[in-house]
């Protein structure tokens, strides 16, 4: 028979999609399926999947890698991809993968700069989410309401809201 090694993501996405659709038939609703996953396979966009890059560590190198990863991923024909704004792991941890560079988190001006740049970039991704461990992600946690970083984040937040009609209508075309 045919060898299949990495297509579990496709079958997993299909199972979630079909399960949600079956439940919707019972209650008469017709909502779009939304499945946030970090695994991908060709064709799974038909099952309402959104891929994200996984739990990354906060560093400028990781941020640079996220940009190229997002561009390459979307070139594959899967329209929905996102990243954890500012990385998932901010501090340095015990495990090899927990390799953040900012133990003082939002008290470190260097992390505030990195987070702000990441936020500015993610504003233009299909899915916009600040998610992670080690520190809170609310805008006011980033140097207070009068601060330079807070103001930059606020401006990008306003821009994101202005882009929502475009993002939503474009999403409807590819869904």
Language model segments and positions:
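Catalytic-domain carbohydrate-binding cleft regions of carbohydrate-active enzymes
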Residues: 1-175
């Amino acid at each position: 028979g045919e060898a299949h090694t990495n297509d579990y993501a496709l079958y997993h996405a299909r199972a979630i999609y079909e399960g949600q659709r079956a439940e919707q038939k019972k209650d008469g609703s017709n909502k779009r399926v939304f499945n946030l996953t970090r695994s991908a396979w060709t064709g799974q966009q038909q099952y309402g999947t959104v891929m994200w890059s996984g739990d990354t560590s906060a560093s400028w190198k990781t941020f640079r890698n996220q940009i190229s990863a997002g561009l390459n991923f979307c070139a594959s024909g899967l329209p929905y991809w996102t990243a954890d704004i500012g990385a998932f792991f901010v501090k340095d941890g015990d495990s090899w993968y927990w390799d953040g560079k900012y133990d003082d988190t939002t008290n470190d001006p260097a992390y505030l700069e990195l987070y702000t740049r990441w936020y500015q970039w993610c504003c233009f991704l299909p899915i916009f989410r600040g998610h992670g461990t080690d520190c809170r992600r609310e805008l006011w946690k980033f140097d207070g309401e009068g601060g330079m970083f807070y103001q930059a984040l606020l401006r990008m937040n306003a821009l994101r809201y202005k882009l929502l009609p475009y993002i939503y209508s474009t999403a409807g075309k590819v869904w």
